[in-house]
């Protein structure tokens, strides 16, 4: 995708993400598909390992030990993928490969035997706090803090089991933190952060403190509260959606996120799988499309 595009303010860009569901388009697709619970849980496990919606759709069709056998083929990446060539891996899970990935699959087999769907069910529980969910996630080999955040978000938004997030948990990741620092420096719509001693926090991204990052986050939550959190629309936008907006806005400003980037790329990646999998075809059809 071209890097030559008009750069939007975070207010404009966030409104676009929320209005077009490019914030997390996969979430909407999964809700539309209405997969049986066990298959949805297998889909989630495959996605959390591989970060490819078409591939996860294909793998979700296998049950029991056969699911783990196919997941191990993806981990080893020796046998050709059903779509030809190598089994794809999303950039976000680029470290889930080789010997580490096969050891991850071995751990899952040892723990869940012939019931791969139990992994997502265990991680989800009944929801709870972000820290409770991510603690369960990180019991699993090669499931660290970042994928823990993603799992917690999908438990809340896809499975509909409420997870409460807090700023400290969200802003332990560098990209949203850096984006919030930049926002405080460059965005005149964000009011000054008045400190406890009555002074004003300096508008310098290098000097921004966690307290000022919290100030920025609260401002953005207030700004976007007119939007309901997709895809359920059951509550106003909150910190986890603001985290995603900040991450994608930073990428947008650096020339790496033109409008509709996720929708376009996820659909393109799913299309080859739609030719070999009915579930992948359903996933492709359920994905939101680019709108004008």
UniProtKB/Swiss-Prot annotation:
One of its GO terms (biological process) is symbiont-mediated suppression of host innate immune response. The keyword rRNA-binding does not apply. Keywords: Host-virus interaction, Inhibition of host innate immune response by virus, Restriction-modification system evasion by virus, Transferase, Viral immunoevasion. InterPro entries: ADDT (IPR040741). It catalyses: 5-phosphomethyl-dUMP in DNA + glycine = 5-N(alpha)-glycyl-dTMP in DNA + phosphate. Transmembrane segments: none annotated. It holds the Pfam family ADDT. The keyword Methyltransferase does not apply. It comes from the Viruses. GO terms for molecular function: transferase activity. Belongs to the thymidine aminotransferase family. Transfers glycine to 5-phosphomethyl-2'-deoxyuridine (5-PmdU) to produce 5-Nalpha-glycinylthymidine (Nalpha-GlyT) on DNA as a step in the pathway leading to thymidine hypermodifications in the viral genome. As a final result of the pathway of hypermodification, 5-acetylaminomethyl-2'-deoxyuridine (5-AcNmdU) substitutes for a subset of thymidines in the viral DNA. These modifications probably prevent degradation of viral genome by the host restriction-modification antiviral defense system. This is Glycinyltransferase. It comes from Pseudomonas phage PaMx11.
């Amino acid at each position: 995708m071209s890097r030559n595009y008009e750069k939007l303010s975070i207010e404009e860009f966030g409104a676009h993400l929320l209005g077009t569901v490019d914030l997390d388009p996969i979430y909407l697709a999964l809700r539309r598909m209405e997969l049986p619970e066990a298959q949805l849980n297998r889909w989630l496990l495959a996605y959390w390992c591989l970060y490819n919606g078409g591939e996860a759709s294909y793998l979700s069709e296998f049950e029991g030990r056969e699911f783990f056998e196919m997941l191990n083929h993806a981990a080893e990446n020796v046998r050709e993928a059903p779509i030809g060539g190598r089994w794809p891996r999303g950039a976000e899970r680029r470290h889930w490969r080789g010997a580490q990935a096969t050891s991850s699959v071995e751990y899952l087999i040892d723990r869940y035997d012939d019931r791969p769907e139990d992994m997502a069910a265990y991680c989800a529980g009944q929801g709870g706090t972000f820290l409770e969910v991510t603690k369960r996630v990180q019991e699993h080999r090669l499931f660290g803090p970042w994928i823990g955040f993603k799992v917690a978000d999908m438990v809340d938004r896809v499975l509909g089991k409420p997870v409460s997030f807090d700023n400290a948990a969200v802003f332990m990741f560098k990209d949203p933190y850096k984006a919030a620092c930049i926002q405080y420096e460059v965005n005149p719509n964000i009011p000054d952060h008045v400190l406890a001693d009555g002074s004003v926090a300096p508008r310098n991204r290098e000097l921004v403190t966690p307290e000022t990052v919290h100030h920025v986050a609260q401002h953005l939550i207030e700004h976007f509260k007119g939007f309901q959190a997709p895809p359920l629309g059951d509550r106003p936008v909150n910190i986890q959606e603001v985290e995603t907006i900040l991450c994608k806005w930073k990428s947008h400003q650096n020339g790496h996120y033109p409008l509709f980037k996720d929708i376009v790329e996820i659909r393109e990646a799913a299309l080859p799988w739609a030719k070999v999998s009915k579930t992948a075809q359903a996933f492709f059809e359920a994905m939101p499309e680019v709108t004008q």
